[in-house]
């Protein structure tokens, strides 16, 4: 027959074209069967799969074909075209007959292979030498093709569909590749119950991301392998479908549907032996539906309803609502299994079950208190994720961090290495000097270097020894895990002799070795010097990782931090002059929180600062942020004068769905989601619209609020400070006189109750009245402001000395009880900073000069020299 492209599949025709090219490259006049065989071996993955299934070594067969081609006569130059040899013509006729026998529409790779197995020229001989005949080849082809027919020019995509587009969870469970599943018995039992139904036997696991939906299916796979399931599920194969692989590369319309149909056909043909698992099942809705093609869900529906296909789905609550509930016909074919977040206690049990796997992987030990800390701390401080996923991640990252420390050079050795390099450089420099002082220093250096080298050698030996001991433990744990898997496999295959031999012989011996090594390592740690390496993850490691993730300091207080917290009040007083009550209240709240005594379901503290302008309300907030986070940038400042309209509430928590800006989120909620540990300042709160306070009620009482997108934002690690000028006139009129303090306080509270609702005021921890500033306090503020100016002048290499009389003069010039410290700031700018700036620009001050400031009594202004 004269071959044409429309008689062959795409891959079949490509094999013939490549065979022609191979004949030309080798300067052969005729295209023969050996060229076609080499073409199939070189290019075609399907031919290779079939031959490997038949037990052929592809490399050896290719070498044999190459050797046969070397023996063929060649031309002096490559021919322009090659002719079909008689052998190829006969082979193509045979391939046509095989096509008809299979009931196919096109000649494909498998027909060409079968024809080669009957080729009298060389194909049969070469294949027989490789250990395969037509019979074996037919069996291998049936195994690869299954029940598929060649009905188009690209049928290879439908062969071995499950192998290509799925992952066998049962095989993974048999090989011990799946993590153990702890608990979740109710959900697994309900899943088995639904799978055992006659029709609509399709459970869908619905739950928040990270609660363990996929783990439930893995647990089911382990139960099937262990035979711990009803008869309806005994010896079933659980395969997870990879929707990404199914869609990837499906270029032409209808190609995706063909692949999916092939998968479903294989599942149906298994007559219930295969259970399909589709993770993220919402992706089947609309998948592949381009250019008017049917989507995957419409292909699944008929089979799901008839019970021909057992399918387990998994998706989140939101995705289920958005995609699957919109298609009631698909939704009714699945039976819902709701998967709730486990409790902290259940999470601890899950972590204990997984602990061994993570210990073996990282080569470290994980203390039980670390597991408890991972569950408890993640539940408390990581609000936007779910247990057990966030607790497992914590444990994993803490173990990875410790492993990194073990494999890195210890700090003690690194310091000595750096010191040796530094001294070696100094030694080289001194070696060039000939004076007696340099020689003496050189001798001293050499002695120091010798001591350091000795220390380095001892520490390196200790490090290698400790590292070796930890590596030995890790290897033993890996070996124990491997033997445990062999024991399980032997028990499953009822090889009880082997199981007993491994369990009571090999495994018992390994566990004894492990126990001895762990005891020896612990004793060395207690008896010997300080260890360079730690090999156990503790609760402190977990706390450090949480702090890195969220910025919330949850680690145990070290001595330096305790001292810092005890001195917090004094530190705040250095920046905020006067206002004893306010500073003490703020410091007390922070100390309660860091000691772990504050209510975990409310913000750390919430204050309302009242007082006239310029007395330090905002400054105290900045000072607190600076003390807690070493930066004023950690202060989330919200100017409430921007929230005077009713609709501006949406700016705080985010616009509702359907409004412009819905995706952007709220200014307050987004700031706290990114930085959960913060000082939040609501400045001039009386200017906000009353509806803004409705949002704040929830924050003040429960420490949480729901943003425009329905996410819960946690405020339990924030300090809320609200400032207001309400009642400031009463404070100014009566605040200076101690005898009238009670009257002033009463008037301020009356003004407060007139403006704010009782339920808002009742939720605040404390309402603090800031007094108007006295002259002596202004004098201290002058000293503060002058120190700040001195620091700025230091950058220009200038000093500043100001006399007491000049400081008093500035305090008087800036004194205004109505406006607080702000007029003082303006007076310092006008009388002190501006003249100094002009003198610098005029070149009157050089480097390292000191600017002396005094008072010119005659002209009533400051003098500079």
Swiss-Prot record:
Q: Repeat 1: where is this region?
A: 8-72
What family is this protein classified in?
Answer: Belongs to the ClpA/ClpB family.
Coiled-coil annotation reads 392-526
Which chain regions cross the lipid bilayer? none
Instruction: Tell me what this protein is called.
Output: Chaperone protein ClpB
Binding residue positions for ATP 2: 611-618
**Gene that produces this protein:** clpB
Under the subunit heading, UniProt states: Homohexamer. The oligomerization is ATP-dependent.
- Where are the stretches annotated Linker? 342-551
Gene Ontology cellular-component terms listed: cytoplasm
What GO molecular function terms would the record report? ATP binding; ATP hydrolysis activity
Q: Which InterPro entries match?
A: AAA+_ATPase, ATPase_AAA_core, Chaperonin_ClpB, Clp_ATPase_C, Clp_N_dom_sf, Clp_R_dom, ClpA/B, ClpA/B_CS1
**Which compartments does it reside in?**
Cytoplasm
Disulfide links within the chain? none
Q: Which residues form the Clp R domain?
A: 5-147
Q: Name one GO biological process term.
A: cellular response to heat
């Amino acid at each position: 027959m004269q071959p044409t492209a429309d008689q062959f599949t795409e891959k079949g025709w490509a094999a013939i074209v490549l065979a022609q090219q191979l004949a030309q490259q080798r300067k052969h006049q005729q295209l023969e069967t050996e060229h076609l065989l080499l073409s199939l071996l070189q290019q075609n993955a399907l031919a290779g799969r079939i031959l490997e299934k038949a037990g052929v070594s592809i490399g050896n067969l290719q070498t044999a074909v190459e050797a046969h081609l070397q023996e063929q006569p060649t031309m002096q130059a490559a021919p322009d075209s090659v002719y079909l040899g008689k052998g190829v013509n006969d082979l193509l006729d045979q391939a046509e007959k095989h096509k008809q026998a299979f009931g196919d529409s096109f000649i494909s790779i498998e027909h060409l292979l079968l024809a080669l197995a009957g080729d009298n020229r060389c194909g049969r001989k070469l294949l027989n030498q490789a250990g395969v005949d037509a019979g074996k080849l037919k069996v291998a082809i049936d195994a690869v093709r299954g029940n598929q027919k060649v009905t188009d020019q690209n049928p290879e995509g439908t062969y071995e569909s499950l192998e290509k587009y799925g992952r066998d969870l049962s095989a993974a469970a048999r090989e011990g590749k799946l993590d153990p599943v702890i608990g979740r018995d109710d959900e697994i039992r309900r899943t088995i119950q639904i799978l055992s139904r006659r029709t609509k036997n399709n459970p869908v696991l619905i739950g928040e991301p990270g609660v363990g939906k996929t783990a439930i299916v893995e647990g089911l796979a382990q139960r099937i392998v262990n035979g711990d399931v009803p008869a309806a599920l005994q010896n079933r194969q659980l395969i997870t479908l990879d929707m990404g692989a199914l869609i990837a590369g499906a270029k032409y319309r209808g190609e995706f549907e063909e692949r999916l149909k092939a998968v479903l056909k294989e599942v149906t043909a298994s007559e219930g032996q295969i259970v399909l698992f589709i993770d993220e099942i919402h992706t089947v809705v609309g998948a592949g539906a381009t250019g008017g093609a049917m989507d995957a869900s419409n292909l699944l529906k008929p089979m799901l309803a008839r019970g021909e296909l057992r399918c387990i789905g998994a998706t989140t609550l939101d995705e289920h609502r958005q995609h699957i509930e919109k298609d009631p016909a698909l939704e009714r074919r699945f039976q819902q299994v709701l998967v709730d977040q486990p409790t902290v206690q259940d999470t601890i049990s899950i972590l204990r079950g997984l602990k061994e796997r993570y210990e073996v992987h990282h080569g470290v030990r994980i203390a039980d208190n670390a597991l408890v800390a991972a569950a408890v701390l993640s539940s408390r401080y990581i609000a936007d994720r779910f247990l057990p996923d966030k607790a497992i991640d914590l444990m994993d990252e803490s173990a990875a961090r410790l492993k990194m420390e073990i494999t890195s050079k210890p700090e003690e050795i690194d310091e000595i290495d750096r010191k040796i390099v530094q001294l070696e450089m100094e030694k080289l420099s001194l070696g060039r000097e000939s004076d007696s002082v340099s020689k003496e220093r050189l001798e001293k250096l050499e002695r120091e270097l010798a001591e350091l080298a000795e220390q380095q050698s001892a520490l390196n030996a200790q490090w290698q020894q400790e590292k070796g001991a930890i590596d030995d433990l890790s290897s033993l744990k890996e070996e124990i895990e491997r033997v445990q898997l062999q024991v399980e496999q032997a028990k499953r295959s009822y090889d009880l002799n082997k199981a007993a031999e491994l369990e009571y012989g090999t495994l018992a011996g390994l566990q004894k070795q492990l126990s001895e090594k762990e005891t020896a390592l612990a004793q060395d740690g207690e008896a010997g010097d300080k260890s360079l390496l730690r090999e156990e993850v503790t609760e402190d490691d977990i706390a450090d990782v949480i702090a890195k993730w969220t910025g919330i300091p949850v680690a145990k207080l070290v001595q330096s931090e305790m001292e810092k917290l005890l001195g917090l009040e004094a530190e705040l007083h250095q920046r905020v002059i006067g206002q004893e009550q306010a500073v003490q209240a703020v410091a007390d709240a922070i100390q309660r929180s860091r000691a772990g005594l504050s209510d975990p379901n409310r913000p750390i503290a919430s204050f309302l600062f009242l007082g006239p302008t310029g007395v330090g309300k905002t400054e105290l907030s900045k000072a607190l942020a600076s003390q807690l986070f070493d930066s004023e940038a950690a202060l989330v400042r919200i100017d409430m004068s921007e929230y005077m309209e009713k609709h501006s509430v949406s700016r705080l928590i985010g616009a509702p769905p359907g409004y412009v800006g819905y995706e952007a989120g709220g200014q307050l909620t987004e700031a706290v989601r990114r930085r959960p540990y913060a000082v939040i300042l609501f400045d001039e709160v009386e200017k906000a619209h009353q509806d803004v306070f409705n949002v704040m009620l929830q924050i003040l009482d429960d420490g949480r609020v729901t943003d425009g997108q329905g996410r819960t934002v946690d405020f339990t690690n924030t300090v809320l400070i609200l400032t207001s000028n309400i009642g400031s006139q009463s404070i100014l009129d009566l605040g200076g006189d101690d005898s009238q303090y009670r009257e002033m306080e009463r008037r301020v509270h009356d003004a407060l109750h007139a403006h704010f609702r009782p339920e808002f005021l009742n939720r605040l921890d404390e309402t603090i009245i800031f007094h108007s500033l006295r002259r002596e306090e202004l004098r201290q503020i002058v000293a503060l402001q002058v120190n700040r100016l001195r620091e700025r002048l230091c950058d220009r290499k200038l000093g500043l000395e100001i006399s007491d009389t000049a400081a008093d003069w500035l305090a008087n010039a800036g004194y205004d009880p109505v406006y607080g410290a702000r007029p003082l700031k303006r007076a310092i700018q006008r009388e002190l900073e501006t003249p100094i700036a002009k003198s610098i620009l005029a070149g009157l001050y050089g480097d390292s000069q000191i600017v002396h400031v005094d008072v010119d009594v005659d002209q009533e202004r400051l003098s500079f020299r």
